[in-house]
Amino acid sequence: MSLRYPISRIRHFRCQLRELLAAVAGPSIRIFDAGTGSLLSSWPPASYMRPLDSEISPDRASSAGTCAEPPEKRRKLTPPVDESGEAQTEQSAKAKARKSQTAEQAWSTIPILVISGTGDHIVAVTGEDKCLRVFEVKQDGKLTQLTERCIPKRPCAISLTPDNNTILCGDKFGDVYSLPLLPRDEVVLPLRKAAESSKPFQPSATKLTVHTQRNLKALEQQLRTPRAAQEKLEPSFQHRLLLGHVSMLTDLILAPVPSDSSTSPRLYIITSDRDEHIRVSRGPSQAHIIHGYCLGHTSFVSKLCIPPWDPRSLISGGGDNCIICWDWLAGRVAQTIPLVHDGDVAESTKAQPPQSDAPDIAVSGIYAIPFSGNPGLTEHASGGILVALEGVSRLLAFSFGTNGRLTALAPIELSGNALDVVALDDRGTILVSVDNVHKPGSTKELRDSAIGPKLLQCFSARSDGGLKWEESSTQAATTINSREAVDIIAETESRKQVQKISDSLYGIGNLRKWARGEDG
């Protein structure tokens, strides 16, 4: 089966008065003109993008943008001297080339893509190598990598401070630290390791003291890799630890709140984790001070969203069958909104009883869509809230009223599972990236062909007899959907690549605890 990479991330931004689109397709970032959809640049350059069914020279791996690490000790190999072994030598060379192919492809996904407020920098995280990369964007759309920093623990959320000078990075193990967007002086800190004790590592727990199957598996893992439990690595670049969770961190946003006593807004760091917690901490200079918590979820929290028109409201969602709207400064639940009941959007004013046989919900995105540029829409609502569920081919739509309450609207039906949403303007126009590889509503079954289906769909909010969403069209979406040759994955590698695509697109449901009834 031949297929195109789906667009897993898409961003709309303005760079020096020019509107651009940044899209992630597989292992690459592509910059498009937001008006025409023409491709302006791509990273990595085409010369470094290895075709999956072709061979490359082994000396290109270091120039493909992978993070520099201390070289391993090399073993000297003596070439064969027997002239009759030319065929064997040629076969050996091909084997080395195949190994170099595997070594070069240090990542296959780009899970995080953030645009600076000025639009001239992009921060991205490449998947398998856990490398945080900063790019410069020119008005002509040219993308140039400026820095790369390998993170010891996998980054799961990135945010930029309002001055666009500092990156806040949250990692898989719950730590949040700050690092400069563009370090002035290259400071390389040695990787620090915890001192090894004279006694061999021995977990404090035993098979007689653990009480759950989950803890037993964790103990067995520690016993299998005792040295890994002793070793703790820290970033080898300039950074400052701000705060930490005792659970896996899932999302992070930086929330500025207008202050009555000063001209500059007060900053807060809002973080969520796998253990149903939402923490509100003070800004980077006082991040050790916890302002409060927003407690009310009963499953993991995967996504946070603050509408730009109401900075004191927070909308959160994850593994529960509802989203929650908070007065986050007070830590108070303002509204609980059911998401799905028997496959239909539930009314926002009624609580639906949970059903044991209902499919598990995993919120993959919460998006705030502004209406400020469309007076006809602002008569009905301050903006729109769209919720994407993992493996669901529709967007759940809500209106955000002037009273701060959400009201459910008819869902937006898509041609494939929703992957990402971006607002194109402040008049209620959006682009939705959809999964062109899997069948709608499934994360396992594949389409017969992934070349024909759309990569992007465009929708606009209408106020005819009430607020609703209708499909529309843009030149950019039409042009991008018609692109084929540059995106096609080779037939010989499609099976392996489809599995990688599935893993990269649908991983939020894995945050759910292993089984109901087990402790956290």
From Swiss-Prot:
Q: How does it assemble?
A: Forms a heterodimer with the catalytic subunit TRM8.
Pathway recorded for this protein: tRNA modification; N(7)-methylguanine-tRNA biosynthesis
Q: What is this protein called?
A: tRNA (guanine-N(7)-)-methyltransferase non-catalytic subunit TRM82
List the top taxonomic levels of the source: Eukaryota, Fungi, Dikarya, Ascomycota, Pezizomycotina
WD repeats, residue ranges: 105-145, 244-291, 296-338
- State the function annotated in the UniProt record: Required for the formation of N(7)-methylguanine at position 46 (m7G46) in tRNA. In the complex, it is required to stabilize and induce conformational changes of the catalytic subunit.
Q: Which organism is it from?
A: Coccidioides immitis (strain RS) (Valley fever fungus)
Pull one GO CC term from this UniProt entry: tRNA methyltransferase complex
> Which UniProt keywords are listed?
Nucleus, Repeat, tRNA processing, WD repeat
Q: What family is this?
A: Belongs to the WD repeat TRM82 family.
Any one GO BP annotation for this protein: tRNA (guanine-N7)-methylation
Where's it found, cell-wise? Nucleus
The annotated region (Disordered) lies at 51-102
